[in-house]
Amino acid sequence: MSDLLIKLSGSRFGAGVVKLLGMPAPVELARSAGPYAEQPLAGKNILLGRSQNGYAIDRLWQIARDAGALPLETTGVKPDILVMDATGCASPSDYRALYDFFHPQMRAIARNARVLIVAALPAESRDPVAAAAARGIEGFSRSLAKELGPRGATVNLAYVAKDAVDRLAGAVHFFCGVQTTYVTGQAVHVTSRVAAPVSLVQHGALKAKVALVTGSARGIGRATAQRLAQEAVQVICVDVPAASEALHRTCREIGAIPLLLDITGPGAPRQLADFIKERFGRLNILVHNAGITRDKTLANMQEQSWDQVVDINLSAVMAIDQVLLAENILRDEARLVYLSSISGISGNFGQTNYALTKAALIGYVAAQAPLLAARGICINAVAPGFIETAMTQEMPFMAREIGRRLNSVKQGGQPRDVAELVTFLCTPGACGISGDTIRVCGQGLVGA
């Protein structure tokens, strides 16, 4: 959707008008339009730093070189990517390494730059001081994301277990790449608890995989189906019969297979399972995107509105999973992604029913992750913030403008931004990440 402030800020005259009015001046965010490149960081100037005794630096250098990044050796050149190995921060005195690395770069960093900090897992340390030092880095990274957000730069944190350093490539490629446009101020956990695939290569890794995306006729679901199709995934697009025209149009555009189905129907899980088995045998990727809102304050909410949201957003998801997992229709090394919401993290006025279901999904993926790890299955949730869709376009003007600006990059996200994160979580390179909930919100100012 069109954002007038971005257009105005893109010209000298318009930028002056925006400044005069005291309005935020959002920058044009860098986005990818195609599939993964063989060298996702090709041509980007990268600067790497480390804390004393950091255990990830050698692997990070290797990943950067293999991805085509250019080590920054010339003064006066703006860094496109900053990567800091902070795994050696085990006491307050070690924090000086963060200051010494980042402080000189703060005025030089390029627009749409990428910052990734790698830290030790606090839970791995038996020393409370070391655990606190590792956890403190999250406060630093979130604050830095707010400082750099107005330039379109993203800052993210990857906690990595000592035995999972070899699984960092996927996180580096995504969080240092163009695809992480609207993901900033986030922390992920890279561990070895999920059985790793033979290859962690990102480029071409999803070719010929079979994916099912619910609620894919429009919006985020449609963008997700499109993005997966760009990686040569065979996509099954599911939506309700009322969305038949839009669903079939989407499927024609991307070569997907349409399936009209109300996922809350009593026989829906069985129908889905039979359809997958008859057409493909088994499934590699499952994206639970379907969901509805029925907003009212609890005092004014009807029983039907409560039940509809719980049935579609949560009960149907669990019922489908139960059948697909019980009948082994989901392959080993499958990827499961669930669309949660900022409302599930922070709550929202008039959304007690919706926030309830989206928070439940966060708990669901965290509880399922260890149960599926032995099969190499990763399960994660994605929590979008203000995303420019037909629904947000219908919001009152002031509410829409406030929603757009209440984040570090001062603008709304695009459905493609959510689809990029979903697609990354479906790759072999994301095998170290399971049980996490990652926001796609431009670091919205509400929630944790």
Residue ranges with predicted function:
Residues 72-74, 94, 297-298, 305-306, ...:
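Substrate-binding pocket helix/loop in short-chain dehydrogenase/reductase
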Residues 160-168, 407-418, 429:
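A conserved structural motif in NAD(P)-dependent oxidoreductases
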Residues 341:
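Residue(s) in the substrate-gating loop at a strand-loop-helix junction
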Residues 69-74, 233-248:
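Conserved glycine-rich Rossmann-like NAD(P)H-binding loop of the short-chain dehydrogenase/reductase
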Residues 133-137, 321, 357, 365:
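Active-site helix of classical SDR
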Residues 149-154, 182-185, 373, 378, ...:
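Short, small/polar-rich loop/turn modules that mediate ligand/substrate recognition or access, typified
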Residues 184-208, 434-448:
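Short C-terminal tail/terminal secondary-structure segment
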